[in-house]
Design a protein with these regions (language model features):
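Nucleic-acid substrate recognition interfaces
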Residues: 1-214
Length: 214
């Protein structure tokens, strides 16, 4: 199964500049394509990729980051059309008729930056996120690196990461990092039975049928 973990990384001035630069280009590109879809009709991910992969903003985005943004935008439009269809059947579920996906804002509504597992490396306590050649040259770095504390290392398996997402908190005005990772799903012991008794003196009492195996 896949799980997610959200935390606020310790970001240096240079790292923040890189994140903001990536956010600027993915936000601008999102808006350009979204405007096109609003004016000229919806397109598939493959059509978007074919038409916009040569846009100059893409030079500053790793190919996997760019492609994930395209897929998110495509999904946003699919969700919109599904909502419009459902609105026609169940209008009372909605306060108003669904509207097309909104535009992003480089200051207040920054677009999410997504790195897939192909753009993520973890090496001896260091999380490395792949960057485009243009960003590497602009900031004189090989990758966007973050030290993972011992505490965080103990919480999840960093070698099983599937995605890393930078998400901007509009209220706190800071960046959070969301990592999505794989974890083996344990089989439930279907032969055992447990019950919870909410009490007055004790918060709760847990009772198991097969106590010796707990």
């Amino acid at each position: 199964m896949k799980l997610s973990f959200k935390f606020k990384p310790s970001i240096s001035k240079k790292q923040l500049e890189i994140v903001e630069e990536l956010s600027y280009h993915t936000t601008k590109l999102y808006n350009i394509i979204n405007y096109d879809l609003r004016e000229n009709g919806v397109k598939t991910y493959y059509d978007i990729e074919k038409e916009y992969k040569s846009n100059w903003h893409c030079d500053f985005l790793h190919s996997h980051t760019r492609q994930q943004m395209f897929k998110v935008l495509e999904q946003n439009w699919k969700s919109y059309f599904a909502s419009v269809k459902d609105f026609g059947i169940n209008p009372t579920k909605y306060k108003a008729k669904p509207r097309p996906p909104k535009f992003k804002n480089t200051d207040k509504n920054k677009n999410e930056i997504i790195f897939t597992n192909l753009a993520i490396r973890y090496d001896n306590g260091l999380l490395k996120l792949s960057l485009s050649k243009a960003i590497k040259s602009l900031f004189n770095v090989e990758s966007l690196n973050f030290e993972v504390s011992k505490k965080l290392q103990s919480i999840i398996d960093w070698n099983s990461l599937q995605q890393a997402r930078f998400n901007y908190d509009k209220v706190q005005k800071c960046w959070y990092l969301i990592v999505i990772y794989k974890k083996e799903e344990l089989e439930n012991n279907k032969t055992n039975v447990g019950s919870i008794d909410l009490g007055l003196d004790n918060i709760a009492t847990l009772t198991f049928k097969d106590v010796l195996n707990q």
